[in-house]
């Protein structure tokens, strides 16, 4: 080997080594050089997996546990050609980045959104406050908001006799990362659960893996099929706001427990400290005059028994006024929010108790959520108990129970609108209904056919219900139910023809076009000679005003009677129901003017 060959081999090996250091997802990227320069400057690693490119996680020199919940923000409306080399300098200006996950597409471009996790919660809040609507490109603004790191699963189909310890042990056998199990006791029988539980996991990834493993049809618990879905995430309230709360949320009460009993129990430490108590089924809100009294009562009564039931007492979580107004505006379909009708914040309740007892859901939850929240103003996939969404503030007592319109907004929204009136088929006819749809008499009249054509007199509709019944029997049921005598069919046909000839005059010369009456219409079979007639009506023509005889003959399939009615003309095809007029395709029509 010559010196030149050795130098070439060394250069090729060094080039191969340098290319091997480029991580997957960065090699071949449109801005590969810029990404490599970013990694060299910050010392963060970068790798692509599961359709996302991770920058950091953890950062270099990190020691300690994973950042707590609330440290991650969601970044949306990212231009498709913007990558980490432009995003990192913007977001690291407000705090130290623990991890940045940019969602990638197959073509190498981003999918328009990313997740940025900071080392501390206050840094994430600062990012939302300062970087929302940040102009990353001319005319392109970023959307930054707090990310919901949901670590809780809803599991239904649990036997009601199982205890919390049994459920925790069984779930821990089939999934990993289980931290806690929340089980709600039945209000009627405290020895039973409500058939569902909430499982808390150590991370969102662990919860997602458990959800995939527990999907229906894969695993059975205690020999039962289970239902698994994401639980409604807990409301993350600012710590400064929680420091001002002086309302306690008390759950696991007995149904028989009264508000006076609760007020007496919570006011025993300082007489007169309880302003009011509102109880709904097995939970209640206790309002105090001061926060100190509320905290003191919570510390002393949490876990104690009241009338044989173990109480769970916590501070009520408020919803800020701005969010409440935004929800109200969305529920009204984008209308302007009314000025300060509500207090500074409304207090949420136990959504699972509300869902269990089937209270009417307010405008932001329940089966009519899509009707009240117009244009998709509020979105989300989280679920609460039994697949129901957690209650929001609209139409509820402090976010707790229905306080007015609620699900009945359809009725209120329908007021004041002009309703279409029905046709007055039978005036003053009262019809007993078996459904909520009522038939209302209106003022719109249907013109009678006899007013235009005198040869077809329209029978007036009877106004009494008994006469209506008789009219129905005579003109609808009789032609089908009566069995005619074949021997008298010819006589009946002759009588009908005579009556028709007596009622309808024969006209030799038609009147002018404007006064021309309706001419008879004959349906003629193909290849059959037409009927010659001298007048406007044939001798055997049977008007629609008296169709009973022809109908009976047709329904009974009596060819002789049918031929007798229509003058023995075999080519005539009678209608089975002449009252419906001629609506079928007619091969040939013969009209005489």
From Swiss-Prot:
Q: Biased-composition ranges for Low complexity?
A: 1-20
Q: Which SUPFAM superfamilies match?
A: RNA-binding domain, RBD
A GO CC annotation given for this chain: cytoplasm
Record GO biological process? mRNA processing; RNA splicing
Keyword check for RNA-binding, yes or no: yes
Q: Which SMART domains match?
A: RRM
An example of a GO molecular function for this protein is:
RNA binding
Location of the protein in the cell = Nucleus; Cytoplasm
Q: Where is this region: Disordered?
A: 1-24
Q: Which residues carry this modification: Asymmetric dimethylarginine?
A: 394, 405
Q: Look up the domain of life of the source.
A: Eukaryota
Does the record's keyword annotation contain Repeat?
A: yes
Listed PROSITE patterns: RRM
Q: Which residues carry this modification: Omega-N-methylarginine?
A: 332, 394, 405
Q: Where is the RRM domain?
A: 71-149, 151-233, 246-318
Q: Which Pfam families match?
A: RRM_1 (PF00076)
Quote the subunit structure annotation. Answer: Homodimer. Interacts with A1CF. Interacts with APOBEC1; form an mRNA editing complex. Interacts with RBPMS.
Similarity comment: Belongs to the RRM RBM47 family.
Give the protein's function: Single-stranded RNA-binding protein that functions in a variety of RNA processes, including alternative splicing, RNA stabilization, and RNA editing. Functions as an enzyme-substrate adapter for the cytidine deaminase APOBEC1. With APOBEC1 forms an mRNA editing complex involved into cytidine to uridine editing of a variety of mRNA molecules. Through the binding of their 3'UTR, also stabilizes a variety of mRNAs and regulates the expression of genes such as the interferon alpha/beta receptor and interleukin-10. Also involved in the alternative splicing of several genes including TJP1.
| Protein name, per record | RNA-binding protein 47
Q: What is the name of the gene encoding this protein?
A: RBM47
